[in-house]
Amino acid sequence: MSITAQSVYRDTGNFFRNQFMTILLVSLLCAFITVVIGHVFSPSEAQLASLDKVETLSDNAGLFEIVQNMSLEQKQVLVQASAASTFSGLIGNAILAGGMLLLIQLVSAGHRVSALRAIGASAPILPKLFILIFLTTLMVQIGIMFVVVPGILMAIVLALAPVMLVQDKMGVFASMRSSIRLTWANMRLIAPAVLSWLLAKTALLLLASRFAALTPEVGAILANTLSNLFSAVLLIYLFRLYMLIRQ
């Protein structure tokens, strides 16, 4: 059976429209969780204020020079802030992936599903999803840091790993290996979707300053919700495509 990207896009659009409110609530809940966890583990405002002083004194300096000129306490604040942002993002992404994939599974099986039920049903697989997303993010970031293209390629070839982990109950490394093989064989169907997702996330990042007009917490939740909606669309597409490839 020949699979066309157009037919999968159409199926994705239909599912997204039919389940929009549930998907929106899942995205909003995950954004709220991300922001709350980030706020809990982030340094206090007084500690963050010390970093503002460094920026003021070093407007013309490079990032490496700025970090070198920081005091030990300022470096600790920077590490804590970075760790809080990374950890909260990973938790939010794991819950989003688990909730969305379980939502798709249950709806496809004919069940009526709420956002809370979808997220709750994903609880048993969240530890494995967290590890998978951590490893995938690490590999993509390392690739982007060095030459960019390898990072983008890693994002593409590992795109099916969460779907395989949930749908076929694979282990973390088995799903990564299988995703690389299957994606490579279906690059024309997967690469455009992943690249579109990356472009959408990049555009949102560039527009992040627009959300500064709101309070920091509301702006962060709104930006994360939009980002989660982009990811939800990609997950729907990948799930539907994977089911067609397996037939």
From Swiss-Prot:
Task: Extract the InterPro entries matched here.
Answer: UPF0259
Protein family according to the UniProt entry: Belongs to the UPF0259 family.
Where does it reside? Cell inner membrane
Q: Where is coiled-coil annotated? A: none
Question: Which keywords, in A-to-Z order, does the entry hold?
Answer: Cell inner membrane, Cell membrane, Membrane, Transmembrane, Transmembrane helix
| Gene Ontology CC terms | plasma membrane
What membrane topology term does the record carry? Multi-pass membrane protein
Write one Pfam family the protein is assigned to.
UPF0259
Q: What lineage does UniProt assign to this protein's organism?
A: Bacteria, Pseudomonadati, Pseudomonadota, Gammaproteobacteria, Enterobacterales
Membrane spanning residue stretches: 20-40, 87-107, 119-139, 142-162, 189-209, 219-239
Q: What is this protein called?
A: UPF0259 membrane protein YciC
